[in-house]
Amino acid sequence: GRVDFYQNKFYSNIEYVLKSEDAIKQGGQLSNRFVTGGSAILFNTGYSKSGFGIDATFRRLENMNFFSERNAAGNVFNESSINYIPGLTKQHDYLLTNIFVYQAQSTVNLDTSQSGEIGGQLDLFYKIKKETLLGGKYGTKIALNASYWAGLSGDYIQDNPDAGTLPSYEVELFGFGGKYFSDFSLEIRKKWTPKWRSILYFVNQSYNKKIVEGSGAMITSNIGVIESTHKLGNGKSIRFEAQKLNSDSAKHDWTGGTIEYNLNS
């Protein structure tokens, strides 16, 4: 079911999806000892006017993966997936900001106490007016994004035929479990002259490699980007870009850069 509401500059919608009982694949095997349903809640709201906009999204997934062949559950390429579920995080533009990319977690895995995800995303845009101290002659555009995703808090029971217990789990409706991913970004776009403009970009990420990829630990990183474009006239321009990623993982410290010359024939 879905309900939408719009009034002037405000909008809001909520959606609820229910999945019927389905066999859960555990340890590479399907068994009728572990059969349960799933659900999804999605809520989105926002407000926009000239020079300002805000958008907030909340989502809760529980056992919402669905495949045309049940044995395909858990494959890393999402083959046979019927309802692909995207991760609700910012789509970054730069190379080093896309090393740790979050995937929506909708599967059940009792070994890692997983049954889905809960979290949200917030987008904020503001344009500082022209002819002000921070806006300057052409104005300044600022964009903020924050997202946070965690597991579902609850109790997870392993299959134990000797003890007479069936595999199962019971989770809280709005309970937050272990952290899966977080992303905070700040983008500043500034036009200096009719021919010269720049972008300053900062991102802080936490990425639970064990949950998203199946092995590893939490990786926290900070990424900074500077980009500047200068128009040379006659359809020609030169663009410079410098990127730096620092993390608490010895294998994930990177530096990158680009110099690009564009011509329009």
Predicted region positions:
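Exposed, low-structure sequence patches enriched in small/polar residues
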Residues: 1-265
